[in-house]
Regions:
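Divalent-cation-assisted or electrostatically stabilized phosphate/pyrophosphate-binding catalytic cores
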Residues: 92-117, 166-183
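Amphipathic alpha-helical interface segments
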Residues: 126, 140-150, 154-173, 187
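Inter-helical turn/loop segments and adjacent helix faces that build the functional surface
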Residues: 126-140, 164-171, 191-204
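Alpha-helical scaffolds flanking conserved acidic
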Residues: 63-76, 137-143, 202-208
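Residue-level signal for inorganic ion chemistry
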Residues: 52, 122, 156
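Conserved N-terminal diphosphate/IPP-binding helix and adjacent helical/loop segment
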Residues: 1-77, 83, 89-91, 96-101, ...
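Conserved small/polar residues in nucleotide/adenosyl-binding loops
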Residues: 209-216
């Protein structure tokens, strides 16, 4: 099967996984929150991060579907970042992927909460992964937090905000992008390798492939 065909299958699988996960909450008292979350989460996108997670899992020798909890989790984190990035206090964007942004439909307060919930729910989903080495769950959670948090994606957004009034050097641009965009892609690849039961040698090779990262990522 070609990479294009596998990518299409990966994309469809993670879409179904995310829909199934949130279907259980449709009758919850806070259903308006879930509507806001699903509006952005299931509103299209290339699903590059899940594709990386699935492919690295496959390359390490296990059924690629074993990476589904991690693949879904990184897409949830990515979506939260887009919702918050579009807010008036950030980029103040009215449209995303050809549709009105989350806060334009549901209001700023609900958009903030939808992003917050996606970020925290991502860890709940990731915890469902069945790993060949259960001790790797601590590594996986640490990678997610590091790459999404202040050393990674959030830190990159801060640097982006701080730099808006001046011209950046090439190195500064690369640093921002490696954190704001690259860090979560790094995490997706590493999480896929973990789900695939990667040997220490395979895991190190994965880290070399995804370098640079906010800081060295190692197994616990």
């Amino acid at each position: 099967m070609s990479l294009d065909s596998r990518s299409r299958e990966y994309r469809e699988y993670v879409e179904a996984y995310l829909k199934d996960f949130y279907a259980q909450f449709h009758d919850a008292p806070q259903k308006d929150l879930y509507k806001a979350m699903e509006y952005s989460l299931l509103g299209g996108g290339k699903r590059l991060r899940p594709i990386f997670a699935f492919e690295f899992c496959r390359l390490c020798g296990r059924d690629w579907k074993d990476a589904a909890p991690f693949a879904a989790a990184v897409e949830m984190i990515h979506t939260y970042s887009l919702i918050h990035d579009d807010l008036p206090c950030m980029d103040n964007d009215d449209y995303r992927r050809g549709r009105l942004t989350n806060h334009k439909i549901f209001g700023e307060g609900m958009a903030v909460l939808a992003g917050d919930a996606l970020l925290t729910d991502a860890f709940m989903v990731a915890s469902k992964a069945k790993l060949a080495r259960p001790e790797d769950m601590a590594t996986a959670v640490g990678l997610m937090a590091e790459c999404a948090g202040s050393p990674g994606m959030v830190g990159g957004q801060v640097l982006d905000i701080m730099s808006q009034e001046r011209e950046l050097s090439e190195q500064e641009v690369l640093d921002i992008q490696s954190r704001k965009t690259g860090a979560l892609i790094n995490a997706a690849c590493a999480l896929g390798a973990i789900a695939g039961g990667a040997s220490d040698e395979q895991f190190e090779a994965c880290l070399l492939y995804t370098s640079p990262s906010p800081r060295d990522m190692r197994r616990s």
